Design a protein with these regions (language model features):
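Intrinsically disordered, low-complexity non-transmembrane regions of multi-pass membrane transporters
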Residues: 1-44, 242-249, 427-454
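Alpha-helical transmembrane segments of multi-pass membrane transport proteins
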Residues: 25-36, 52-54, 108, 120-121, ...
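Membrane-embedded alpha-helical modules
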Residues: 32, 43, 91-93, 113-239, ...
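Membrane-embedded helical hairpins/re-entrant loop segments and their flanking transmembrane helices
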Residues: 35-44, 48-51, 55-56, 60-89, ...
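Short hydrophobic alpha-helical membrane-embedded segments
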Residues: 50-57, 76-80, 100-105, 193-200, ...
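Hydrophobic alpha-helical segments within and immediately flanking transmembrane helices
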Residues: 60, 77-89, 104-116, 345-348
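Membrane-interfacial helix-loop connectors
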Residues: 67-69, 105-118, 287-291, 333-334, ...
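Helix-loop-helix junctions that connect adjacent transmembrane segments
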Residues: 178-192, 231-274
Length: 454
């Protein structure tokens, strides 16, 4: 994920400045407008891109749902619902033009933390409360302050810690064998064979990704899944099981809670809301750079679609969503030009959500390769932090280690506290500034710097 902040967008998020090749160099280019939701001239490209990205989103969403300790069917329902909301929102207030919404790998351990502490029965209320907090942030346009209050390198450190959790969680699938093949000896012939298959699959996936990432990044996903399905027909390997859970529509109200539990849930939802918003702002910065027509993004408009989708998903026990960079990049390289592709993605995901029996053909080793690679990419995001200097890299590494060791919530808070203490000590001891002046300077800088962030 890119860790660069985005440029300030134009007032009209739908405008695109495009110079005519036949016009004089001194002539001011006329803005070219077009719907973010649908343009007839791009319909064919958007349909093809939606089919490709939708198929690629299935295994990725399955892995994220499993990492979040949510039913796979609920995760797919969240992706489908968020896609439909994103397309509808694009008619009125587009945040970006090719971003593909869905459940995010970076939030998976955060959701798993909520499930472990509050129970799955209270997560609908947590998602609803998170959506309400995001609605307040959207209404007051506070998202422009968040990347300043919470430095980008801390977010990259958090994502690296999350990536390590994902990598280790799904690495177990690489050597898992069927129950009937388990013996007293751990490294028996069946497990060694499974490790060899997983290694070959992962190496092939990485090779294809490096070869096609700038042209057709969905190719390695298709190759791995198709190869895994074929292999599963000729030999016995552990398969994904998707429980066909019913989706109930009900009010997202808390159950069996105490006062202290409610306080903890509020703090948890605040953390979840902030991380979700920051990830969306960072994704928009990257999506703007890969837009085929160089159109500007509006992060506050993207936040509108996020909180509406989160609020709606809480009524069927769904998860949080944002425009994921992996799916958005695939969408762009597959030929998407408008959010009409997102509508097609939603339809593809809906088909598999309603026909979960087709997902039982996915081998676990194929899912392991995809999710281990996803975790690695999140850890590799620390490379971006090197541009901020050694202090930022050190703090990002500390944040990542804390997130992995003590948890998302506690790790981020401790890292932010360390960051605040270091800056306070530098200003008070080195620059001899009074403590009150340091605090005032911080808020003055926060207000001033936010004017350059959309």
């Amino acid at each position: 994920m890119s860790s660069e902040t985005e440029d300030k967008p134009s007032v009209n998020g739908n405008e695109e400045n495009k110079a005519s090749s036949s016009a004089p160099a001194s002539q001011v280019a006329e803005p070219v407008t077009g719907s973010a939701a649908f343009q007839a001239k791009y319909a064919g490209r958007d349909i093809a891109a939606g089919l490709i990205t939708g198929a690629m989103a299935i295994p990725l969403s399955i892995g994220i749902a499993m990492m979040s300790d949510y039913p796979i069917k609920v995760g797919l329902a969240t992706v489908a619902f968020a896609s439909f909301v994103g397309w509808i929102n694009a008619w009125f207030r587009p945040g970006n033009y090719i971003g593909s919404p869905g459940i995010a790998a970076g939030l998976a351990p955060v959701l798993a933390l909520g499930v472990a502490n509050f129970g799955i029965q209270n997560m609908a209320f947590c998602i609803c409360l998170t959506a309400i907090m995001q609605a307040i942030i959207w209404h007051l346009n506070w998202q422009r302050y968040l990347l300043i209050a919470v430095p980008v390198y801390l977010v990259e450190g958090l994502l690296a810690g999350v990536g390590l959790k994902i990598l280790l969680r799904f690495f177990e699938f690489a050597y898992e064998i069927p129950a009937e093949s388990v013996t007293e000896e751990f490294w028996n012939d069946a497990r060694i064979q499974m490790c060899a298959i997983s290694a070959i699959g992962f190496a092939g996936f990485v090779y294809l990704f490096s070869k096609f990432r700038d042209t057709q990044p969905a190719v390695p996903y298709f190759a791995l899944i198709i190869g895994g399905v074929i292999l599963a027909q000729v030999m016995t390997v552990p398969m994904i099981y998707v429980e066909d859970v019913p989706l109930h529509f009900r009010l997202p109200l808390p159950e069996d809670f105490t006062t202290m539990l409610m306080i903890y849930m509020v703090l948890y939802c605040l953390m979840l809301a902030i991380i979700d918003v920051i990830e969306q702002v960072m994704s928009n910065a990257a999506i703007e750079k890969i837009d085929p027509l160089k159109r500007k993004c509006n992060s506050n408009n993207s936040l509108l679609a996020i909180w509406i989708a989160n609020l709606g998903s809480s009524f069927f026990g769904g998860m949080t969503n944002l425009d994921g960079l992996a799916k958005s990049t695939t969408n762009k390289l597959a030929g998407a030009y408008t959010k009409f592709s997102v509508l097609i993605i939603g339809c593809v995901v809906t088909f598999f959500m309603l026909n979960t029996e087709y997902l039982d053909y996915l081998p676990k080793f194929a899912l392991a390769a995809i999710m281990v690679f996803t975790g690695y990419k999140m850890i590799a995001g620390l490379v971006h932090v090197t541009h901020y200097g050694p202090y930022a890299l050190m703090l990002a590494l500390i944040c990542g280690g804390l997130v992995y060791k003590v948890g998302i919530f506690e790790g981020l808070l401790i890292a932010m506290a360390i960051h605040a203490i270091v800056h306070f000590m530098v200003y008070t001891k080195h620059d001899n500034m009074p403590g009150r002046a340091v605090i005032k300077r911080y808020f003055d800088n926060l207000k001033k710097d936010s004017s350059s962030v959309s």
